[in-house]
């Protein structure tokens, strides 16, 4: 077993050796530009790009013509949300999303608000899932876009996307789904889920970083305004020379996900349950955040009461975990996702996200259980609040002195 142990698979995944192997020739011998139509170097590159497009499409039940390459899911989210809003704004300027979306969606929505659009931010239930009835109630005659993620990046909670998509489709509203954390882990089918636009990332499914895709439905056709001008690549949706090695890597990652996903999900779920039960046996006052029933296989988001999440992370340097999402973990604010779910500020501050994946082992899980048990107990020994609770004091009944 190698130390440190990687348990942050929602932040990124290692590149699968089979993916790297598929990519390497496109750095060295097959280095053509896929847009060069006049010679064999270009044709070979284009062939590889189209084969990868086919693989990504197959993974989500789409046609290859509906896949647009991007530099990653942040760009896909921006292109989907802003591109759809700008194209359909003559029809209306109202957008609907959820408070627990990824920052790439939320900040795109805030940018559109500054341009005169109106956004309804819906609250999830206590278990982290969004009730489709709330989406239905939020729709107005001038609503042009609904954007709801499939699986949350912090809690791993899976939203009822098929139902939300059906509601949007029935109202003639474009439906975008950020499917970054679910694709490759659980089934995702654009037809069954009534999705019009879907964001996909390579590095969340054992592919390279800086590589993504956007699914854009053709029937009924969804239109977007391009957010980047240039040579008109990718049917004008996304100009810029194609990253052929990255695309080949994403295609291979998609193929492996399609072939191995279901068996992998069973194994990783068993590891997660081993971790959860082990931690619950070692420690008291431990809360799992979000629905355990509706959740991606490798995610465990836990609050350790009376322990500061950041302090705990410093204490367990041998295990790579995170508090909050990797994109916002540099700020010491409590997780906005957990706060939107109604988790108290104290418990949100004490949350840790464990992410298990393809290369995680039972040995690593058992080591993590022992390490967290030891370190949490040590930190709680220094907590006067924990002492009081163990002595039977109800903290809610205490009148704290006002420091101001």
From Swiss-Prot:
Positions of the catalytic residues: 327 (cysteine persulfide intermediate)
Cofactor requirement: pyridoxal 5'-phosphate
GO molecular function, one term: metal ion binding
Annotated compartments: Cytoplasm
UniProt keyword Cytoplasm, yes or no: yes
EC nos: 2.8.1.7
Pathway given in the UniProt record: Cofactor biosynthesis; iron-sulfur cluster biosynthesis
Subunit organization: Homodimer. Forms a heterotetramer with IscU, interacts with other sulfur acceptors.
Family: Belongs to the class-V pyridoxal-phosphate-dependent aminotransferase family. NifS/IscS subfamily.
Protein's name according to its UniProt entry: Cysteine desulfurase IscS
């Amino acid at each position: 077993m190698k130390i440190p142990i990687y348990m942050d698979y929602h932040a990124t995944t290692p590149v699968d050796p089979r993916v790297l192997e598929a990519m390497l020739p496109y750095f060295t011998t097959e280095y053509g530009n896929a847009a060069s139509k006049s010679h064999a170097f270009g044709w070979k590159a284009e062939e590889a790009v189209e084969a990868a497009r086919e693989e990504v499409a197959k993974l989500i039940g789409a046609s290859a013509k509906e896949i647009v390459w991007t530099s990653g899911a942040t760009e896909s989210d921006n292109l989907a949300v802003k591109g759809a809003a700008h194209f359909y704004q003559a029809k209306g300027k109202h957008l609907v999303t959820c408070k627990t979306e990824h920052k790439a969606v939320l900040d795109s929505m805030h940018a559109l608000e500054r341009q005169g659009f109106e956004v309804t931010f819906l609250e999830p239930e206590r278990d982290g899932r969004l009730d489709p009835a709330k989406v239905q109630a939020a729709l107005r005659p001038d609503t042009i876009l609904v954007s709801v993620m499939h699986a949350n990046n912090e809690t791993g909670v899976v939203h009822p996307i098929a139902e939300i998509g059906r509601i949007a489709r029935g109202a003639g509203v474009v439906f975008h789904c950020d499917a970054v954390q679910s694709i490759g882990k659980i089934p995702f089918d654009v037809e069954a889920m009534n999705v019009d636009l879907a964001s996909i990332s390579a590095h969340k499914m054992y592919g390279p970083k800086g590589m993504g895709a956007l699914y854009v439905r053709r029937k009924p056709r969804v239109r977007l305004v391009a957010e980047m001008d240039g040579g008109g690549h990718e049917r004008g949706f996304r100009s810029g020379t194609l990253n052929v090695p990255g695309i080949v890597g994403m295609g291979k990652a998609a193929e492996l996900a399609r072939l191995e996903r279901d068996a992998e999900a069973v194994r990783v779920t068993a590891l997660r349950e081993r971790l959860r039960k082990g931690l619950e046996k070692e420690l008291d006052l431990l809360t799992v955040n979000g629905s355990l029933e509706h959740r991606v296989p490798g995610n465990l988001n836990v609050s350790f009461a009376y322990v500061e999440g950041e302090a705990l992370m410093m204490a367990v340097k041998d295990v790579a975990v995170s508090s909050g999402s990797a994109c916002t973990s540099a700020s010491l604010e409590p997780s906005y996702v957990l706060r939107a779910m109604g988790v108290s500020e104290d418990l949100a501050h004490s949350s840790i996200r464990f992410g298990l994946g393809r290369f995680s082992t039972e040995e690593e899980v058992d080591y993590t259980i022992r390490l967290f048990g030891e370190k949490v107990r040590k930190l709680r020994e220094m907590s006067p609040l924990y002492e009081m609770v163990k002595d039977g004091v109800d903290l809610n009944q205490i009148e704290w002195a006002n420091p101001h």
